[in-house]
Amino acid sequence: MAAVALLRGAAVGRRSPAWHWRLSGTASHCLARGFGLLGSNPADGVAWTCFRLDGRALVRVRGPDAAPFLLGLSTNELPLSGPPTGAAQPSARAAYAHFLNVQGRTLYDVILYGLPECTEGAPSFLLECDSSVLGALQKHLSMYKIRRKVTVEPSPELHVWAVLPCVPQTSETAPLEERVEGTTMLIRDPRTARMGWRLLTQDDGPALVPRGQLGDLQDYHKYRYQQGIPEGVCDLPPGMALPLESNLVFMNGVSFTKGCYIGQELTARTHHTGVIRKRLFPVKLEGPLPASGVSPGAIVTVTATGQAAGKFRAGQGHVGLALLRSETIKGPLHIKTSESQLVAVTAVVPDWWPTAAK
């Protein structure tokens, strides 16, 4: 039944803008589940681990036409921009989305941030992207700018941090509150509560987070893979990955009620047919690995039949992501490495995915 349910695109609603500023006990517990690799002894006083993501970069898009311009290119609604109002919570200032090519395949995965600054009524947004495609994303945006009153420019002065809890929160844990002030933004990750918070700042991340410590970037990527979160061009190869196979719906990254955008036709048609035969699954690798790791694109094989189940996409150590046919995920799988070694593969369905996908 689980495999059958995974064939259908489970709909996930966008989060309500009426999120609470302070983490609730339930959300805190959800954030910390599965964080064994980030665990810290509570006695040492550390509550949060901060990871500086030098592999992520920021592009600023501003101007009177910034909002309609971005709406016509991205898969999702835009986050709020402009000065805070009593009706809007800072949580609504971040949104996850993909930019697609005309064939409907993913070019860039981005987190959009609506900035509080607003000059003469002109909104301003920051787009977080893989740093290796910073120039390509700017070129992509400029290509569609035409005569719109929009300025596209990098923001190298700001750094992106991921902030994750070390252990489940208790009444003694220092809670985080969302901040949108000056050059600092501390916002809940819009993809899933499991990914904690995003921090944009010119300053040192741990210094801004109560009881924060600097984390090892490899731990961040291992945890991200365990949760099934693709991020960047290694996980989402430009022009190859399909947004719904990449679980864009599960990560709150697409709106099926917004206006038209580049690449919409294939995404909308797939959604309305309700059948997604392949998905990007988190996988565990068992057995000795080659010194260079498993190669991206390595064929994942159904052990019992020898048929191809899909392809390994990317990973860190013994965890990673693989694009697999949903009906094959329960059976024993393996990868034959370039050194002719067999590596056992176990596909995992994350427990934060919608019930219909389990």
Curated annotation (Swiss-Prot):
In-chain residues carrying the UniProt-annotated modification N6-succinyllysine: 311
Organelle transit peptide: 1-94
Molecular function via GO: transferase activity
One Gene Ontology term from the biological process aspect of the record: heme biosynthetic process
UniProt cross-references to InterPro entries, sorted A to Z: TrmE/GcvT_dom1, YgfZ/GcvT, YgfZ/GcvT_CS
Keywords: Acetylation, Heme biosynthesis, Mitochondrion, Transit peptide
Superkingdom in the source lineage: Eukaryota
A GO term from the CC aspect: mitochondrion
Keyword match Mitochondrion: yes
Keyword Transit peptide assigned: yes
Residue list for modification N6-acetyllysine: 222, 311
A Pfam family matched in the record: Beta-barrel_CAF17_C
Subcellular location(s) per record: Mitochondrion
Family listed: Belongs to the GcvT family. CAF17/IBA57 subfamily.
Function: Mitochondrial protein involved in the maturation of mitochondrial [4Fe-4S]-proteins in the late stage of the iron-sulfur cluster assembly pathway. Operates in cooperation with ISCA2 in the maturation of [4Fe-4S] proteins.
Protein name: Iron-sulfur cluster assembly factor IBA57, mitochondrial
Encoding gene (name): Iba57
